[in-house]
Amino acid sequence: MSTAMNFGSKSFQPRPPDKGSFPLDHFGECKSFKEKFMKCLRDNNFENALCRNESKEYLECRMERQLMAQEPLEKLGFGDLIDGKSDKN
């Protein structure tokens, strides 16, 4: 007796992400920014709100090197940091 089940001819069709791909940084072009961001997270008990500047710099690096799609910083939630303003005092 066969134990294989056939649920019809429908198969899973993968769908690309809405924002496009997020390629790996194989050449370490943004490694220093990533490490600075991760250090900030560790130093601040993983409270990401305290590391927004580091996060912004990391994403800017990725966009400049075509490692992610170009997006306005306002759309990524960094509108208040564009003019050098920061919640960190």
From Swiss-Prot:
Modified residues (N-acetylserine): 2
Subunit structure: Interacts with CHCHD4/MIA40 forming transient intermolecular disulfide bridges.
Stated role: Required for the transduction of an SCO1-dependent redox signal from the mitochondrion to ATP7A to regulate cellular copper homeostasis. May be required for the assembly of mitochondrial cytochrome c oxidase.
Biased composition (Polar residues): 1-12
Residues covered by the CHCH domain: 27-69
Record motif Cx9C motif 2, residues: 51-61
Regions crossing the membrane: none
Gene Ontology CC, one term: cytosol
Motif (Cx9C motif 1): 30-40
Keyword Cytoplasm: yes
Keywords from the named record: Acetylation, Cytoplasm, Disulfide bond, Mitochondrion
Localization per record: Cytoplasm, Cytosol; Mitochondrion intermembrane space; Mitochondrion
Designated name of the protein: Cytochrome c oxidase assembly protein COX19
Pfam families, per database record: CHCH
Any one GO biological process: intracellular copper ion homeostasis
Gene from which the chain derives: COX19
Region (Disordered): 1-23
Source organism: Bos taurus
UniProt cross-references to InterPro entries, sorted A to Z: CHCH (IPR010625), COX19 (IPR051383), Cys_alpha_HP_mot_SF (IPR009069)
Disulphide linkage map: 30-61, 40-51
